[in-house]
């Protein structure tokens, strides 16, 4: 039987040794959406982040679990948040009703979640932030394994 990656409890990074940087949760962030495994972008002030929206360009990274917290604990506005910026395999949140297959390119969706990149004009769907490591097709938000490696340039799906 083949070996595979296991989704660990209370951590987001599954494999790899990525760069992790602390940023402040910005004033424009929605605290309830600032959960580990959600994608973030820069907020209005230096060194601050907020949840990414759909089709975002300029992704900073995704939120990691604070050492003294649990995976279900959201960061509050003003908290110092751990943001993973480097390449790794991570357990991230796929938007409900997205049908992805291993290897599909992923882009940001609302509230810092991920969605499958659809066929479209180059750059019209935001940055490709990674690729699905497993398939998913459920009607609720789902944790999936993602090869996190944000692209430097937008690319169209084919």
What are these regions (language model features)?
Residues 1-158:
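Surface-exposed, low-hydrophobicity beta-strand/loop segments enriched in small/polar/acidic residues
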């Amino acid at each position: 039987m083949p070996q595979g990656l296991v989704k660990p409890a209370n951590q987001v990074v599954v494999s790899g040794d990525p760069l992790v940087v602390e940023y402040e949760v910005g004033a424009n962030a929605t605290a309830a959406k600032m959960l580990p495994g959600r994608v973030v972008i820069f907020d209005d002030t230096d060194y601050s982040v907020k949840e990414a929206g759909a089709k975002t360009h300029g992704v900073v990274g995704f939120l990691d679990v604070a050492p003294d917290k649990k995976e279900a604990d959201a960061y509050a506005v003003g908290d110092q948040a751990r943001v993973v910026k480097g390449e790794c395999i991570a357990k991230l949140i796929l938007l409900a009703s997205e049908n992805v297959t291993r290897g599909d390119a992923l882009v940001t969706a609302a509230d810092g979640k991920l969605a499958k990149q659809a066929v479209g004009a180059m750059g019209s769907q935001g940055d490709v932030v990674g690729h699905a490591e497993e398939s998913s097709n459920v009607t609720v938000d789902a944790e999936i394994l993602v090869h996190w490696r944000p692209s430097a340039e937008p690319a169209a799906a084919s």
